[in-house]
């Protein structure tokens, strides 16, 4: 039996550690935009830090604070961080503009 925390899948793309200022919007219970940053990025998604707990598969909008990129997205996971906040895995669905990593 595999350990509880072992992922049973392998990522298709590499994650690059990079702090990018972003805005999250679309939380079902807490309306309003949240200014935050990424921890790592790929061409198809990002891991962001949020003060809000997001539900898996919830829709959201992620946009760069510069306005150069915007994506309808899906929450892939939400993990509690030590201290305050959450690490949220975001999968890009419908994008416009230029992201920091291209496929």
Q: Where are the regions that the model predicts?
A:
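Short beta-strand-centered aromatic/proline hotspots
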Residues: 34-36, 71-78
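N-terminal helix initiation/capping motif
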Residues: 1-41, 51, 95-103
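Short beta-alpha junctions and helix-cap segments that line functional grooves
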Residues: 8, 58-60, 74-77
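Short, well-ordered loop/turn sites that connect or cap secondary structure elements
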Residues: 53-55
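Short, conserved beta-turn/loop elements at beta-strand boundaries and strand-helix junctions
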Residues: 27, 43, 78-83
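Short, solvent-exposed secondary-structure boundary/capping segments
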Residues: 46-50, 81-93
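Hydrophobic residues positioned within well-ordered beta-strands of beta-sheet architectures
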Residues: 20, 71-73, 88
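Short conserved beta-strand and strand-loop elements enriched in small hydrophobics
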Residues: 20-27, 57-69
